[in-house]
């Protein structure tokens, strides 16, 4: 695990073979589409001792256009629009809540939009299926005597995560893998739709509710539903044309904390379909298990560190569409002024030669 954290934190120059000797070896190289004039390469690194996979990338040297080109333009903007992205637990919702509480920022939660608008019927139907197994509730439900619905809030997304579930033995609360993949695909489509709704909500926030500023609080899985290596990705183009993308970047200590937190309370999450199938197949082979024998919590604990490593180069590529702030600095921000200064500094840093 320490080697994974180190690899995530360390900038490895892939053009220097000597840095790949010893504990790691290149097992696969993927050439992604060019970002502007620079190519973005992703390499899969496998640790010889721990059979863990780390994905690393060289960032494109060519940044994408942003709606704020300088710190001065940002500070003087009458309407500030920001899209926060990064791993769950690094401060997106924390900062969004601070800004929302000022009364001048509209808080658009992508997870909330997914759970209430796009996946609300799926969630409600799953609740009704369980209710139909209880004779007392079945009778009331069939006679329209009761109303069943989830109660999702910005702070409580349990209905959504419970519906997403964990793959594995049903006796242990798991979901059959094919059903799990279906729900993952539902989430993928829903997240893309919710992200594409952002410009509409920017307009509604200003025109209807008279908010001066807008903060979009993205799901941690945004990097899995867009192609950050494609400068023509429709979702990233839509977002970057209407708001400033801001990556909240963690370090090795943050990664270790996230892993420890997840180990204590493993929660469902979305994975890129190719990555999920690859890791599911690997887990079954390594553990010599059939699908119905998999302990759901054991599997998602095992895949979590792999998922962090898989997402890192995708976040890196997304950073070309905006700016980067450190998660430690976000944690120290206590006000709108702190946040505004943080973004201004990030813009100044990016503009520096």
Name these PLM-found stretches.
Residues 287-353:
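NTP-dependent small-molecule kinase module
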Residues 217, 237-280:
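Conserved phosphate-donor/acceptor-positioning beta-strand/loop module used by diverse small-molecule
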Residues 148-152, 156-238:
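Glycine-rich phosphate-binding loop used to anchor ATP phosphates in small-molecule kinases
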